Amino acid sequence: MKLPIYLDYSATTPVDPRVAEKMMQFMTMDGTFGNPASRSHRFGWQAEEAVDIARNQIADLVGADPREIVFTSGATESDNLAIKGAANFYQKKGKHIITSKTEHKAVLDTCRQLEREGFEVTYLAPQRNGIIDLKELEAAMRDDTILVSIMHVNNEIGVVQDIAAIGEMCRARGIIYHVDATQSVGKLPIDLSQLKVDLMSFSGHKIYGPKGIGALYVRRKPRVRIEAQMHGGGHERGMRSGTLPVHQIVGMGEAYRIAKEEMATEMERLRGLRNRLWNGIKDIEEVYLNGDLEHGAPNILNVSFNYVEGESLIMALKDLAVSSGSACTSASLEPSYVLRALGLNDELAHSSIRFSLGRFTTEEEIDYTIELVRKSIGRLRDLSPLWEMYKQGVDLNSIEWAHH
């Protein structure tokens, strides 16, 4: 077993060796290095064929038509293209958008930008377990609502939203539905031939593909229109200009092919490991599970350890690569906005750790993690005056702290 142990698969994943090997064939003079838009010679044709194969592999995993897959630089761009693109195209119908407070920043900040441009956005608060109440969503829908954006799996707490039911509600009212599926694709089954989803964002690097590549699914029947955000040579049916990075696209395609093959068995394996981890730490005093095991992705476990400062816990767990909140927010000292939206107080939000497991996680690593967490929590609480006061029965909320 190698230390440190990587348990931050929701931030990024290593590229699968099979993917890396495939990508190497599309870069050098000996490989297929041509521009797929070069229609006048074999170098271009071969590159175009490689892109077509990858497009099919991605479409296969999610039950889409390959013509519905638009390549982007990643899920952040896909979210931007979907939300801005749909809002701008359909603004004559209305300027109201609905999303949730626990979406990824790429969705929230895109909506904030649209608010500055005159759109109105409703931010739904989830229930305590992170799941959106569909009655609240329905109540928020208006005649001028043109777009709903609610993610599939949350990147911090792993809860799974009922995208099938949300899709039905949107379709019945003629509202475009966008789903950020970054954390679910290749991990949970997605069948866009059945789901009433109009736009869906995908990433390469969360599922053992390369960074810097993603895709946006844009439904053809019934046809969904978006306005391009990147202009140029008219690539990707005019929706996203820019020379296609063949090596990255091939890598993403191969990663999605592997995911389709291994998904069923791998998810059972990860669910077993996640449950093993939770069962190993859940009897520690004052430990809280954030999210919902039953309605949760099999690879994410978010836990708060009361009376332990999250930062000091991460330092104590230096043999584990884990995060507090998401990679995007863990660089700041703000408590996670996702956990705050669930109703956690600052203290509990600050003392949260996200464990996210993946393809190369072993049982041995999980057992080591359990032992290390138990030891570290014990040691940190021995040093904590707050823990001592709690054990003495002092109500910490009633204390007036002096401000210096």
Curated annotation (Swiss-Prot):
[2Fe-2S] cluster binds at C328. It comes from the Bacteria. InterPro entries: Aminotrans_V_dom, Aminotrans_V_PyrdxlP_BS, Cys_deSase_IscS, Cysteine_dSase, PyrdxlP-dep_Trfase, PyrdxlP-dep_Trfase_major, PyrdxlP-dep_Trfase_small. It catalyses: (sulfur carrier)-H + L-cysteine = (sulfur carrier)-SH + L-alanine. Pyridoxal 5'-phosphate binds at A75, T76, N155, Q183, S203, G204, H205, T243. It is found in: Cytoplasm. GO terms for molecular function: 2 iron, 2 sulfur cluster binding; cysteine desulfurase activity; metal ion binding; pyridoxal phosphate binding; selenocysteine lyase activity; sulfur carrier activity. Its EC number is 2.8.1.7. GO terms for biological process: [2Fe-2S] cluster assembly; detection of UV; iron-sulfur cluster assembly; L-cysteine catabolic process; oxazole or thiazole biosynthetic process; selenocysteine catabolic process; sulfur compound transport; thiamine biosynthetic process. The active site is at C328 (cysteine persulfide intermediate). Keywords: 2Fe-2S, Cytoplasm, Iron, Iron-sulfur, Metal-binding, Pyridoxal phosphate, Transferase, tRNA processing. The modification N6-(pyridoxal phosphate)lysine is found at K206. The C-terminus (residues 376-404) is important for interaction with IscU. Master enzyme that delivers sulfur to a number of partners involved in Fe-S cluster assembly, tRNA modification or cofactor biosynthesis. Catalyzes the removal of elemental sulfur from cysteine to produce alanine. Functions as a sulfur delivery protein for Fe-S cluster synthesis onto IscU, an Fe-S scaffold assembly protein, as well as other S acceptor proteins. Preferentially binds to disordered IscU on which the Fe-S is assembled, IscU converts to the structured state and then dissociates from IscS to transfer the Fe-S to an acceptor protein. Belongs to the class-V pyridoxal-phosphate-dependent aminotransferase family. NifS/IscS subfamily. Homodimer. The homodimer interacts with IscU and TusA, other S acceptors. Each subunit of the IscS dimer contacts a IscU monomer. PANTHER family: CYSTEINE DESULFURASE, CYSTEINE DESULFURYLASE FAMILY MEMBER. This is Cysteine desulfurase IscS. It comes from Escherichia coli (strain K12). The gene is iscS.
